[in-house]
Structures are given as structure tokens and as C-alpha cells.
């Protein structure tokens, strides 16, 4: 790849979203206190949270078509999510929502703009890894800084893992991105990071990039693999516009290149020898991130269903004298799509309820999320294919959103774990019984 001129983006706002509360009391003109939006949602519970998500989704929907056509980042969408109090949805110090509520929020936001919802899901998932810290690997000062910035205003976090040669690390291998020990200008030890990451969801909007990389083979402690935590405005960080995908175009999942990026020594997190075993944080949060990804595509199918229902009710061919919605063929096809949507919802939210219950129930449910992902994502694609086949040319027109919903749905298969891995592992398990 050829490195283009680095492009920068505005830093995060330091103003936490707030809402003024008024009361019916005679307060003698005493000013009403300002209450942070996330505190208001925490006090209001799921009903208030989902109402905020619906309002934010309406705002996201306004620019969804334009950002899809341009393949452009939508900072106004992220700002709307934070203004609604949803930016720190799952942080205990934020809204503190459980998985079921979080998934319902994501589903609603995805009906507005699934590409923004994808960026948001990555943020929620990696904040959770950081705060849960099951392996006890995160330096407290660094963790608290990231959390504080997210609470203060849009400060997106994502992990950058995939590389041009290696592909996804979920299938094994040592990343080519290298962190090498060096001495900084102040005489203190630092890391110098070099490498290239692809499919970096959120790219221009990120404040923190958790970069999967390896130390050099000549490192005094031997080669180790882990995370290098990079503030996105660090000199040497370059974003190269390579994302020109069929779907999720506004996720701006461009390449990020690190040119001799200098990091404090404490920004290397969770380093361990190659082959030391799976990242415990990743295992613990697999159910969460998979459920939230499924929620995105559950929302995408519902968007397609709703548009189709509206179109069939409004379309009145002159030779019929009634809407297409009156014909049994169309009723049956929409019924099939609704059956798929209902199945997806039941699978997703029965799983999230199990996880929220904790204990043995959560432990028993956890491994099943991969199978649920396979079923749900294929149901979404099947449902939208059926909708396209039902109405023909109008469904493929850029004048209507159905083709966009379908293109976005096709991206569901690329998320880890992928279908072939899940089905092979499941089949092997059955055959070994």
C-alpha cells in the first residue's frame, strides 16, 4: 500500500452532556440543577434508556443514506449518542446498563444507521474489557484516563487487530506490528511502534487505538504479544483511506499505519509469550460483543421489513385497484420475513437474559452465542434477499433503502467468529461425543 498524507480529526469534547431538570415546586426562582444525561438514564431505568435510543436513532437516520453513498464518517451521530447519555451505556460509572438493555439500544440505533452502531458497539465492548480487566493487566492510571475521557465526552475506543498479511488474529499467528524498546528524549524507557492495521472500524473518530502487536524477537524478555495503547493524535499515526466496501460504508474501517510512534512504557498491556493461550479478556467478553453485533443486524432486518411493509401498502397498481399488501403472495412473503425476525429476537434476548442472570445460567449459555450468531446473521440475509426478490427493480434502486439494508447485512458474516469456524467446531464436538 502507498501511504497517503496523514489526516487528522477534531479531538473529543471535554463537555459532558447535561440536561436541565425543572420541577413543579415553587422554587422561588432557584436555578434547577444540571444533571448529566447518563445519570438521568441510570435513574430512569430501561424505559428511559430505550426512549433516548429511539430519539437518537431518528437523528442517525437523517444522514444514513448520505454517509453510505459517500463512505464518510458521521461525527454528528457519535455526538448525538453522547448527548443522549448513551456513550457510556455499560460503564458502571456511566449508565450501568445490563446486556439486554444494551442490545436493545444497539438494535434501535442500528435501525437509524448500522455503521454508526458498529462503531458504537466496538467502543462499548472494548470499554468493558478495560473495566472488567479479568486478567488484571491494565495499569490503573491508564485505565482511569480512558474511562474519564469517555465520561467527559465522545472519546471512542477500538481494538486494531487485523493485518494485511496475517489476516484476523482469531485464526492464530504473530502480528507483524512491532513495539521495540527505546529511550525517550527525557531518558525514560518508551516503546516505538511500527506497523499497519486494516479494517480499523471508526478510524477517524477514534480517540484510543488498542493495537495488537508483538515485541521484537531480540527483546530482553523474549518476544511477547499484547496490546499497545495509542492515543489517536500521537505523532506518527496515519489513517489511509482504503475502506470502499459494499456495506457498512460509513464505518470508515480504513487502514491505520504507525510510523515510529513513541509510547510511554506503561502503554504496553497484557504482553505474553506467543502461544500462551487466548486472551482472557477476549474470552470473557465474547458473549457481550457477539450479542451486540447480532443486535445490529437484528435491527437491519427490521428496517428492511418496515420499509417493505410501507412500500407494499402504498403501491397500488392500476390493474389491481388495491395495494400489493392485499395479495396473499405478498402477505405470505412478509410473514416469512417476520418469522425470521421473531426467531432472531427470541434467540438474541433469551441469550442476553441468561447472561444477565449470571452464575451457572450464564456459564451454560455462553458457548451457544457462536451458534446463535450463525443462525441470526443467515436469517437476516435470507429475509432481505426475500424482500428484494419480492419487489424486483424498486428494491435494487438507490432511491430506496432496501438495497442499503441488504448490503449492510452481508457484512454480518465477516465478524468473528465466522460461520466456517463455528460450524466446524460444532460438528467436531458432536462427532467426538
Question: Where in this protein do the model-derived segments appear?
Answer:
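A short core secondary-structure module
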Residues: 196-239
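Glycine-rich flavin
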Residues: 75-83, 87-201
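Glycine-rich phosphate/cofactor-binding loops in nucleotide/flavin-utilizing enzymes
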Residues: 21-24, 391-433
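Glycine-rich phosphate/pyrophosphate-binding beta-alpha loops
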Residues: 198-203, 292, 412-415
Amino acid at each position: 500500500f502507498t501511504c497517503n498524507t496523514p489526516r487528522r480529526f477534531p479531538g473529543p469534547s471535554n463537555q459532558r452532556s447535561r440536561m436541565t431538570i425543572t420541577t413543579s415546586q415553587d422554587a422561588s426562582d432557584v436555578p434547577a440543577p444540571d444533571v448529566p444525561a447518563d445519570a438521568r438514564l441510570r435513574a430512569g431505568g430501561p424505559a428511559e434508556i430505550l426512549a433516548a435510543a429511539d430519539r437518537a436513532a431518528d437523528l442517525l437516520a437523517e444522514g444514513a443514506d448520505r454517509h453510505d453513498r459517500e463512505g464518510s464518517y458521521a461525527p454528528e451521530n457519535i455526538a448525538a449518542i453522547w448527548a443522549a447519555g448513551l456513550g457510556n451505556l455499560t460503564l458502571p460509572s456511566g449508565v450501568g446498563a445490563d446486556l439486554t438493555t444494551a442490545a436493545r439500544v444497539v438494535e434501535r440505533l442500528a435501525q437509524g444507521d448500522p455503521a454508526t452502531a458498529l462503531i458504537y458497539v466496538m467502543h462499548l465492548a472494548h470499554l468493558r474489557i478495560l473495566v472488567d480487566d479479568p486478567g488484571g493487566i491494565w495499569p490503573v492510571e491508564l485505565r482511569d484516563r480512558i474511562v474519564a475521557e469517555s465520561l467527559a465526552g465522545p472519546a471512542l475506543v477500538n481494538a486494531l487487530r487485523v493485518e494485511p498479511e496475517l489476516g484476523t488474529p482469531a485464526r492464530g499467528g504473530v502480528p507483524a506490528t512491532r513495539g521495540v524498546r527505546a529511550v525517550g528524549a527525557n531518558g525514560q524507557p518508551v516503546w516505538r511502534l511500527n506497523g499497519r492495521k486494516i479494517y480499523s472500524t471508526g478510524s477517524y473518530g477514534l480517540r484510543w487505538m488498542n493495537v495488537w502487536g508483538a515485541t521484537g524477537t531480540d527483546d530482553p524478555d523474549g518476544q511477547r504479544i499484547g496490546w499497545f495503547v495509542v492515543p489517536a493524535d500521537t505523532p506518527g499515526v496515519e489513517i489511509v483511506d482504503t475502506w470502499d466496501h459494499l456495506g457498512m460504508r460509513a464505518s470508515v474501517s480504513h487502514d491505520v499505519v504507525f510510523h515510529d510512534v513513541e509510547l510511554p512504557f506503561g502503554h504496553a498491556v497484557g504482553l505474553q509469550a506467543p502461544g500462551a493461550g487466548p486472551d482472557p479478556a477476549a474470552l470473557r467478553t465474547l458473549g457481550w460483543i457477539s450479542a451486540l453485533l447480532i443486535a445490529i443486524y437484528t435491527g437491519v432486518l427490521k428496517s428492511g421489513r418496515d420499509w417493505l411493509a410501507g412500500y407494499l401498502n402504498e403501491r397500488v397498481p392500476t390493474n389491481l385497484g388495491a395495494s400489493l399488501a392485499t395479495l396473499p403472495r405478498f402477505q405470505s412473503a412478509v410473514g416469512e420475513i417476520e418469522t425470521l425476525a421473531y426467531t432472531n429476537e427470541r434467540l438474541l434476548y433469551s441469550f442476553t437474559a441468561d447472561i444477565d442472570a449470571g452464575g451457572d445460567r450464564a456459564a451454560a449459555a455462553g458457548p451457544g452465542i457462536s451458534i446463535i450468531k450463525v443462525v441470526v446473521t443467515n436469517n437476516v440475509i435470507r429475509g432481505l434477499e426475500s424482500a428484494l426478490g419480492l419487489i424486483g427493480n424498486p428494491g435494487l434502486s438507490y432511491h430506496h433503502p432496501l438495497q442499503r439494508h441488504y448490503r449492510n447485512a452481508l457484512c454480518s458474516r465477516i465478524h468473528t467468529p465466522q460461520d466456517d469456524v463455528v460450524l466446524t467446531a460444532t460438528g467436531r464436538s458432536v462427532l467426538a461425543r
